[in-house]
Structures are given as C-alpha cells and as structure tokens.
C-alpha cells in the first residue's frame, strides 16, 4: 500500500491544572499523524502520539526526529508496521497503529463492538486531580452528584491526614457498595512508611491503590503486594518494560493484584494486548486508562477497551480536559463513556 504521513504538532491547554504528586500540567504537546493512501481514496487515517513529559520512556530530546523516521519507514514499507522496531517508543507505535486502523476502517468506530455501535457505554471512574482540601472536596461532590459510582483520587501531595479526611468524608455518606474508591499515589510513599499508610487506607474499604512507591523497587513492591491489606495496582512500574520477556519477569517478580494499562506509555495496542495476556495467565486483574491524550487518542483507547469483556470501571478520560480539544463523537452519561454512533 502506497501511503504518505503528515505530522502535525499541536499544543493543548488544560482547562484547569492537572496535578499529581510528581508534576502539574497546564499544557500538553501532542503530534497528530495524518495517513493517506491512493488505495483508500478520500480517507485520512488519524493517530495521536502523546508522550508524557518526564514520565514516558520515549520522552526524548530528539522525539520529533524519531517520529519522522518511523513515519518514513512506514511509507517505505508500503504501510506495513514493524511493531517490534518501535517497542521502545510506545507513543509513536500507538499513533501509527491507530492511524492505520482509522484509514482501514474509514470510521472513528475502529472496532465492531456494542460500544462502537452506540449500544453500550463503558463504565469509567471519576478522576479527582490534586488540589487543596476544599477544591478536592468540591470536585468529589460534583462527581458523586453526576452519578459516578467509582471515584479515583490522586493522593500524595496535600498531606496524608488531609487525604484520609477526604476519603472518610466520602465513606461517611456512601458505603463501599455504593461508591468504589480508588487512590493513586504516583509513587509518593516511601518503602519505610508505605505499609502503615496502606493499613490505614484499607480501613476505609478502598478498591485499590496505584503505584504506592516509586517504580524500580521490585523487591519492596513485591513485599507490599504480598502483605498489604489493600490491593496494589502497578502503573508507572510498567513504563519502559517493553519486551514480552520483560513483562513476564516483572509480573512474576512483583505479582500485583492489578495492572493499569495506558497504550501511550505501555506499548501501544499490541503491547497492551501482551500485558493483558500475561496478566490473565497469572490471575492478575487489569483495567485500561487514558494518559491525558486529546480526543483522538481517547477515542482510540476507548474503542480498543470495548473489545474486552472487562466489568471493572475503566480509567478513560471524559474528553473535557482541554480548552482546545478535537471534536469527537464521545459523550459521558452518568458514569459511562458513550460513542455517539449517529454522529459519524
């Protein structure tokens, strides 16, 4: 297949700062790929490459050169994607995978599912970004009023006692049967105090905690996963672990209760499929999360997510992060993300 790819950089602006225990984002740079081919006249396949600064394994000074080279190779290979050659560049792989898929389907409905047909929504968690106590409390109450049954809080920045107070506030009004609570520490705890904090958090009947300690401490993380009364989900731990053998080693060494998959960070669609296969062999649960992509990337992740029969609330965005997002037939109804098939 003859093909051409145009690379279009774009700077997106957050409606409000997105804060974790590590960093606060106010803008977001992404690269859109526009793929065309005379074999598919009138069509353009669009993908999004969106490495996260200071987090993605492919957040590199020469990223644009690497991206341009990958696009040239796809053109030279007649549209045949060499996924193995791009294992170390998951955001580029994800962008190319989804651009190809969009070109071939000719629709934003990238896979044939009940979601893509507008028959079913995907349950999602309501995400509460870092802020001061009053701001976070207000956001929590907004999410609960909107109908979210799973709330995820970013913790590790405003003080552990204040964060416990927020969680207690929710539990004072809603039981664990009514509202599922997840927390994400983004590696904020130290190995020395992590277990004590996990014990205190577990008293509030939380579903899980993502990445309690910094990535790369396999022995300490394995100990927490084995002994913690609160289930542990790996997130940042998966970044840079790009080979099948590496994935097997990590999961066998730590044996977490869950893993959280972000295609832009964890190997694109094909890498995500590898993670899921290895996790399920070990009876490790998983869910899929977007990573501050615009609606182009969010739609691609949601379309892929819908191909699985996973009943857990997913960590997909709402499409409302940016002031200058791309229009996409996505809509949040109560606590589900829907694809509005009538709009395509």
Predicted ranges, named:
Residues 124, 155, 288, 296, ...:
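Long, contiguous hydrophobic alpha-helical segments, chiefly transmembrane helices and signal peptides
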Residues 309-314, 318-320:
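Short helix/strand-capping turn motifs
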Residues 10, 36, 50, 264, ...:
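Short, loop-centered acidic/histidine patches that primarily coordinate divalent metals
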Residues 71, 80-82, 257, 282-288, ...:
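A short pocket-lining beta-strand/turn micro-motif at the edge of beta-sheets
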Residues 158-299, 303-305, 322-333:
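Catalytic core of soluble alpha/beta enzymes
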Residues 1-181, 186-188, 192-195, 200-202, ...:
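N-terminal capping/lid subdomain adjacent to the active-site entrance of alpha/beta enzymes
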Residues 34, 66, 132, 221, ...:
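Enriched - but not universal
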